[in-house]
């Protein structure tokens, strides 16, 4: 892609926008940056771009800028129906996201990973396996470093692994990973998409530009994902925990088996540090992607056995008076909470937060079977109570700290207090990490007489 001399509009000045603007300006583009925040709110990002030839339109957007740009690079947070983006499209301008822009400059094999749940764990583990197998590897995308930072920095790598969100996929046009992974699809982001089908359609775009020499790793245990197999041009490489596969990767009797073109590799799971049905899925996907792109099985197994998982995903905080307290703040949708509930019995569930628009009804069977008490918080608590409250003993709390104290008083020895919200955090907290720390502080204050 030739960018020198082109008029390029960068929409949004968060970390990714800064990296995009810097890369473009240093490579001769005529860059305009626009953001709805004012100069004082953007002091940090503006300092990072000091000395570069960049025009700023702050505290507003100007439709004329969108219509005049050769290319508009948009933040994933900007919805497709934005009138400014529609103005750009009407004027025949190219609208892309950072991941599309950056991918045009990547020449080494790329693994792109998406799904409603498990993306970050799978992306991180895939990078760990590649590195253990001796490949210089970049890991980023929707986590950590934006892909454009690799392009901008000029670092020489041999493999690229990126986590991709549905938002990032909305504006791709030529993005083509060598291996694309779709872990699962459950209802999520219905505060962004008008229908569940719109969300599915965005996810499936990860395969849009692949060819038969590429691979689509599909979790065929997920009926929606399985239904996509006939729609992709890439070679489908299935994964399953429910059946043995002649070609693909599957789990049976404590062993993950990889089969491809006559090659078979076996990976006993007994020494894995991360457990649970969902983590076996993540590990299978990582093994598939890395072995398809040249990794040695023994080195891959050693990397998996050494991987301890990521924070805020079903982490044991402490055990007190025979009750175990688990923090699962990253569980921001129903699908991830289903997997958490399936991992325990005798649960006191703390849930709630900012409502994302999906139904909580899929949780009903597990709530009925495994949840003894439920304590609800946040903006979503009333709707959650309407959909699930009749299935078990259900209480309301005003704060997370109050919810923890109430859960502690309700739970018998041998039980589990599980904080798995099924909602985003933005009604009460800065992000899911702050929410996690508040839960941990409240749990650690139990029995001390102290206020968290």
From Swiss-Prot:
GO molecular function: ATP binding; UDP-N-acetylmuramoylalanine-D-glutamate ligase activity
GO biological process: cell division; cell wall organization; peptidoglycan biosynthetic process; regulation of cell shape
Pfam family, one: Mur_ligase_C
EC numbers, comma separated: 6.3.2.9
Residues noted as binding ATP in the record, renumbered to the chain: 115-121
Domain of life from the UniProt record: Bacteria
Keywords in alphabetical order: ATP-binding, Cell cycle, Cell division, Cell shape, Cell wall biogenesis/degradation, Cytoplasm, Ligase, Nucleotide-binding, Peptidoglycan synthesis
GO cellular component: cytoplasm
Pathway, per record: Cell wall biogenesis; peptidoglycan biosynthesis
Main location: cytoplasm
Entry's localization field: Cytoplasm
Catalysed reactions, semicolon-separated: UDP-N-acetyl-alpha-D-muramoyl-L-alanine + D-glutamate + ATP = UDP-N-acetyl-alpha-D-muramoyl-L-alanyl-D-glutamate + ADP + phosphate + H(+)
Family the entry assigns: Belongs to the MurCDEF family.
NCBIfam families (alphabetical): murD (TIGR01087)
Summary of the function given for this chain in its UniProt record: Cell wall formation. Catalyzes the addition of glutamate to the nucleotide precursor UDP-N-acetylmuramoyl-L-alanine (UMA).
Protein name: UDP-N-acetylmuramoylalanine--D-glutamate ligase
Organism: Geobacter metallireducens (strain ATCC 53774 / DSM 7210 / GS-15)
């Amino acid at each position: 892609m030739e960018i020198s001399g082109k008029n390029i509009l960068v929409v949004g000045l968060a970390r990714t926008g800064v990296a995009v603007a810097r890369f473009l300006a240093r490579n001769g583009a005529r860059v305009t940056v626009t953001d709805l925040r004012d100069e004082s709110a953007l002091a940090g990002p503006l300092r990072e771009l000091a000395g570069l030839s960049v025009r700023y339109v702050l505290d507003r957007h100007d439709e004329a800028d969108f219509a005049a740009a050769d290319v508009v690079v948009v933040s994933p947070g900007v919805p497709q129906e934005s009138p400014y983006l529609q103005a750009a499209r009407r004027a025949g301008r190219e609208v892309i996201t950072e991941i599309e822009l950056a991918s045009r400059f990547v020449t080494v094999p790329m693994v792109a990973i998406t799904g409603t749940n498990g993306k970050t764990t799978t992306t991180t583990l895939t990078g760990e396996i590649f590195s253990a197998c001796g490949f210089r590897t970049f890991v980023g995308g929707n986590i950590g470093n934006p892909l454009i930072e690799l392009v901008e920095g000029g670092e020489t790598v041999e493999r690229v692994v990126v986590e991709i969100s549905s938002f990032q996929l909305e504006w791709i046009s030529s993005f083509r990973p060598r291996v694309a992974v779709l872990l699962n699809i459950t209802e999520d982001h219905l505060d962004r998409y008008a229908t569940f089908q719109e969300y599915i359609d965005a996810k499936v775009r990860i395969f849009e530009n692949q060819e038969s020499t590429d691979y689509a790793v599909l979790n065929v245990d997920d009926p929606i994902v399985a239904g996509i197999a006939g729609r992709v041009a890439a070679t489908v490489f299935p994964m399953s925990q429910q059946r043995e596969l002649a070609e693909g990767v599957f789990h049976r009797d404590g062993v993950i088996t990889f089969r491809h073109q006559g090659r078979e590799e076996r990976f006993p799971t007994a020494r894995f540090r991360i457990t649970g049905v969902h983590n076996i899925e993540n590990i299978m996907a990582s093994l598939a992607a890395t072995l398809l792109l040249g990794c040695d099985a023994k080195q891959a197994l050693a990397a998996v056995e050494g991987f301890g998982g990521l924070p805020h995903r079903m982490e044991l905080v402490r055990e007190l008076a025979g009750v175990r307290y688990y923090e699962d703040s990253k569980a921001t949708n129903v699908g991830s909470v289903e997997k958490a509930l399936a991992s325990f019995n005798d649960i006191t569930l703390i849930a709630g937060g900012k409502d994302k628009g999906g139904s909580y009804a899929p949780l009903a069977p597990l709530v009925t079977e495994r949840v003894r008490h439920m304590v609800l918080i946040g903006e979503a608590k009333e709707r959650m109570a309407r959909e699930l409250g009749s299935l078990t003993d259900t209480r309301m709390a005003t704060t997370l700290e109050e919810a923890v104290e109430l859960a502690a008083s309700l739970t018998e020895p041998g039980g589990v207090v599980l904080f798995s919200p099924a909602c985003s955090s933005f009604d009460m907290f800065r992000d899911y990490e702050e929410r996690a720390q508040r839960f941990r502080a409240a749990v650690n204050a139990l029995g001390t007489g102290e206020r968290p």
